[in-house]
Amino acid sequence: MRIISYNVNGIRAAISKGFIEWLQHSNPDVICLQEIKATEDQVPFLDIEMAGYPYQYYYPATKKGYSGVAILSKIKPNNIVFGTGIEHMDFEGRNVRVDFDDLSVMSLYLPSGTNIDRLSHKFMFMDDFQNYVNELKKEIPNLVICGDYNICHKAIDIHDPIRNANVSGFLPQERDWLDRFLKNGFIDSFRFFNDQPDNYSWWSYRAGARGNNKGWRIDYCLVSETLKEKLKRAYILPEAKHSDHCPVVVEIE
């Protein structure tokens, strides 16, 4: 199974830049989208179906034009779960999950910490999401949690770790949380295969950051350790330019 995660920063804007044609060419089995910024009726369902994705699940935020996640699949899932059931996590449309025979795939959009209030919300979300996943794994051990975590894990994952040491997305508390999350039974699939620097998934729109590859790796496909032996490949697709993020990919037997 080939799974892509992609923060599209507005699905309608991405579509205007050729997203559907790119999707048809890339041809993943499942694609997890974040920051769709649209409701289901604002998305061209039939065009996406014609591209090969009849199974489409959208979970928008209550606030219009904000946040929201989706999963598009070639394969019919056995079950679909929208949100976590925890109100403060769900009103912003931050995760949707599909269950297949051998594994489950979740699209996650973890909050950013753009100011003190949002940082506090992010920390609360992180803690509650960890608890939610700990319980979920008892029921569903084979989990693939794809998405925009809004956290660079290590210095290798950010272009200027010293200057960004006190910036949300690279704070010690955030990085420690990701450490704990991984130690609770997940694998960073990209780093499982690739230990090289200068591999990023997000670039600021400012000052030619993308052209100069001054980026952050904040998008991940985290895979349950139970699936370790089935990991085949994981990589990043920086040439896809429908967003300020780029797609990240994992392939599982």
Which residues fall in each region the model found?
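N-terminal, active-site-proximal structural segment of metallo-dependent hydrolase catalytic domains
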Residues: M1-E49, Y55-Y57, A61-S67, H153
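Active-site beta-strand/loop signature of hydrolases that rely on acidic residues for catalysis
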Residues: N7, L23-D41, V105, V133-A155, ...
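Conserved beta strand-loop-helix elements of the APE1-like EEP
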Residues: K64-I80, P197, A209-E229
